[in-house]
Amino acid sequence: MCQIGVDCKTTKNECYLGSSLCLDDIGFIEQIQTTLRNDLCIDVNQMHYAGFSYGGVQGWNIASQAVDGLGFASFYILAAIPFLGNGMPPDEANFSLFHLIGNEDKLMPPNSNYLKRPGLEGHDDIVENKDGMYKPVTTDLLNKYAEKMGDCEDEESWATEFDGIKNFECFERKCQNGKAIVRCNGDFGHHPYDDLDGKNGAEVAPMILDFMLAHPRK
């Protein structure tokens, strides 16, 4: 079984696509959820997803493709943008989103600025990563999710203790039924925690947890 966010080593009879992992990832997560429900006393309204890099891409896939987002109350997606045409919002998004990414991330670029040139000619809404793969502009994708969440307000500054570290800043958009979208960015690459706390996210985690607990499933 593959770890979320870690590439699998496939055999010659297997097919690996960079936009997904090796097995039935959604089915695997569903099985974990079933086991937790059966064996532990958990609050099913406080199930949250967190994924980094390709684990974050998987989060986009779950939010987009799985029935009702597999019941997750929120998705925390770190340094991840889906491949172009993937990860689009479902007809109804009954969950919150927290997205954190670096402006200088070349594997998962939020826009074309890192290229020091415009995006694809005639297609400013398409971003090319360092490997030549195409991705959407982050803010465009989040706007599409906001449309499906319903009655979202305009973005407002969302203060954190990390503000100003390499121009780190966050913005929040409140939506109907207690849902929200928070997006954060700063001038760092594919490993934001290296710059934000230097402790593999140990000091950032409470901020993420507070967001999750404040946005239960409704």
Residue ranges and their predicted role:
Residues 1-48, 61, 197:
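Serine-hydrolase catalytic machinery in alpha/beta-hydrolase-like enzymes
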Residues 1-20, 115-131, 155-172, 177, ...:
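Surface-exposed intrinsically disordered loops and tails
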Residues 17-28, 54, 129-137, 196-200:
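Extracytoplasmic/periplasmic, Sec-exported soluble proteins
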Residues 25-32, 55-59, 71-72, 137-141, ...:
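Stable alpha-helical elements in mature extracytoplasmic
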Residues 98-101, 108-110:
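Conserved hydrophobic ligand-interaction patch in extracellular adhesion modules
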Residues 98-100, 132-218:
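C-terminal catalytic histidine-bearing segment of alpha/beta-hydrolase fold enzymes
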